[in-house]
């Protein structure tokens, strides 16, 4: 698989909330903090404001606007930000639904399609390379998302057998497409493995690392895969990914290690050699540098969150 598919397969984003929200001319809605989630919204009709904690300026959303909110921060959607907001949790519990549409206030001056994705395990490998608000506003971007939006609207408004599963799968497709559009759009401005995928040379090297994480890769081998000299490759990788090739290899190995320990209960003695480490001590030291805790401490902390 390619690196983006690798990361998404590891995190297994699952759309646990997908729906359509409607509002009249005057409304305001407060959405709470949701750490470890990604929210995706597409404005089907009307305009509104988005104000997010930690972001200086509110964003104006218009018909056709699509956005990702990957950091789980609390935010307000509103026709007018001076209005007192309604709590989204209360709306979900008691709000009226008609033809699959949840109403914030009477009327349909505003319609937005939304999906909330839960990530399995630690999502920082993906979330840390994304800004608080990912805006997809230009016409070519909207066109590539249009079919998914229309299909999800159809499933929401006219529920059929199996419709919930279809909506969940289409929502996942929408998320992946939005990430692809973002990395292409922000190639010159973004730094991180996600943006590096838009550069064919860096993508080739990242694919080698993701394809064989246990291999004892050298800088020369990775540079050769990118068709570059060692010096130019090392400089280019650091500039686009934000870290050195060898540091990135370690980060990816430790991400895989954490996932395996959480999901399979494998021991360090079996995981370490499977990820290219000749000794448990070297593996444990690398793991602690990455996660700030020993492998055993990390697993205990993960289990405590599940209970």
Q: Language-model features: where?
A:
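Residue at a beta-strand N-cap/secondary-structure junction
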Residues: 49, 58, 216, 248, ...
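An amphipathic alpha-helical interaction segment
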Residues: 113-123, 129-207
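Alpha-helix-centered segments that form part of catalytic cores
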Residues: 96-125
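Generic protein-terminus/edge-of-domain signal
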Residues: 1-103
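Extended, amphipathic alpha-helical scaffolds
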Residues: 306-307
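Basic/polar phosphate-binding segments, predominantly the helix-turn-helix DNA-binding elements
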Residues: 173, 177-183, 204-255, 260, ...
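Generic structural signal for alpha-helix termini and adjacent loop/cap motifs
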Residues: 46, 80, 155-158, 181, ...
């Amino acid at each position: 698989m390619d690196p983006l598919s690798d990361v998404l397969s590891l995190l297994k984003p699952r759309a646990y909330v997908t729906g359509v929200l409607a509002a009249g001319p005057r409304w305001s809605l407060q959405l709470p903090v949701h750490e470890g989630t990604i929210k995706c919204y597409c404005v089907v009709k009307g305009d509104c404001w988005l104000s997010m904690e930690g972001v200086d300026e509110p964003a104006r959303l218009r018909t056709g606007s699509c956005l990702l909110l990957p950091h789980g921060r609390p935010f307000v959607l509103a026709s007018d930000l001076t209005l007192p907001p309604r709590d989204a949790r209360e709306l979900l519990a008691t709000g009226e639904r008609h033809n699959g549409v949840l109403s914030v206030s009477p009327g349909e001056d505003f319609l937005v399609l939304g999906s909330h994705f839960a990530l399995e395990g630690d999502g920082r490998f993906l979330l840390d390379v994304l800004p608080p608000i990912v805006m997809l506003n230009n016409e070519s971007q909207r066109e590539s998302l249009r079919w998914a939006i229309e299909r999800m609207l159809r499933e929401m408004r006219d529920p059929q057998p199996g419709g919930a599963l279809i909506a969940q799968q289409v929502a996942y497709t929408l998320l992946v497409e939005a990430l692809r559009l973002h990395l292409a759009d922000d190639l010159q401005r973004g730094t991180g493995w996600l943006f590096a995928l838009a550069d064919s040379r860096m993508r080739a090297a990242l694919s080698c690392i993701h394809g064989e994480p246990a291999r004892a890769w050298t800088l020369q081998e990775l540079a050769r895969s990118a068709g570059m000299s060692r010096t130019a490759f090392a400089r280019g990788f650091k500039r686009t990914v934000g870290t050195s090739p060898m540091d990135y290899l370690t980060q990816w190995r430790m991400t895989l290690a954490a996932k395996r320990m959480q999901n399979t209960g494998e021991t360090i003695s079996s995981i370490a050699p499977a990820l290219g480490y000749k000794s448990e001590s070297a593996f444990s030291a690398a793991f602690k540098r990455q996660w700030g805790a020993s492998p055993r401490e990390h697993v205990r902390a993960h289990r405590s969150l599940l209970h």
